[in-house]
Amino acid sequence: MTSFSKSDTCVIFGGSFNPPHIGHTVILSYALDYFNADFYIIPTKTPPHKVVDIDFDKRFEWVMKSFKCFDTYKKNQIFLWDLEKHIFGVNYAIKNVEYFRKYYSNTIILVGEDALGNIEKWYKYEELLNITTFAIYPRTRDGSLYKRGQQILGNLYSNVIELRDFPLIEISSSDIRKRIVEGKSIIGFVDGEILEDVTNTYLMHHKSHGGNWNE
């Protein structure tokens, strides 16, 4: 692999995308205007701290369709990569960062403020923050998790960019799954192209598991 553009910075936007929703695309839109960088959208196959029962290929397909809206805007800076499809078992953020550091001078992990709520559970989080930057968008109204991050990370917090001007996204994948099984509409929550498939997939999953979620 080589850098796909002349940028010396890459932004890694990962997650289970279970399912991808409008909040993900809004955050990427803001980030594209904030950072002069290449962006890599990397769906997680096997997250370290939770179980995701929906097949990786299905979620990757949803992400591909959801982010098609960027085909006419800075598309040469955005790369959707099925990197984790080819990794057996759990992968960790630090492994991805170490890979991208071979090709970029600067790496940035784009993540929500809620990541600071359990940052101690991240694999080698101190080492990770010594070699990369976290760009953190809001997930709470009072910014309480930013404050927690400052307390926990101490001097390492100098490697955190607070994206407080980004919109507070109060949509979550777990809320969407909950709405589906409760028979509520998710119109406007996910891209229209995946709306029916997302709804049917989670309804079938919920039914096949006796009304229980593993996640």
Swiss-Prot record:
Catalytic activity from the UniProt record: nicotinate beta-D-ribonucleotide + ATP + H(+) = deamido-NAD(+) + diphosphate
Pfam families given in the database record: CTP_transf_like
SUPFAM superfamilies with a match to the protein in the record: Nucleotidylyl transferase
UniProtKB keywords: ATP-binding, NAD, Nucleotide-binding, Nucleotidyltransferase, Pyridine nucleotide biosynthesis, Transferase
Transmembrane segments: none
One GO BP: NAD biosynthetic process
Metabolic or biological pathway: Cofactor biosynthesis; NAD(+) biosynthesis; deamido-NAD(+) from nicotinate D-ribonucleotide: step 1/1
Highest taxon in the source lineage: Bacteria
Family, as annotated: Belongs to the NadD family.
Record's function text: Catalyzes the reversible adenylation of nicotinate mononucleotide (NaMN) to nicotinic acid adenine dinucleotide (NaAD).
Protein name as annotated: Probable nicotinate-nucleotide adenylyltransferase
Species the sequence originates in: Fervidobacterium nodosum (strain ATCC 35602 / DSM 5306 / Rt17-B1)
Name of encoding gene: nadD
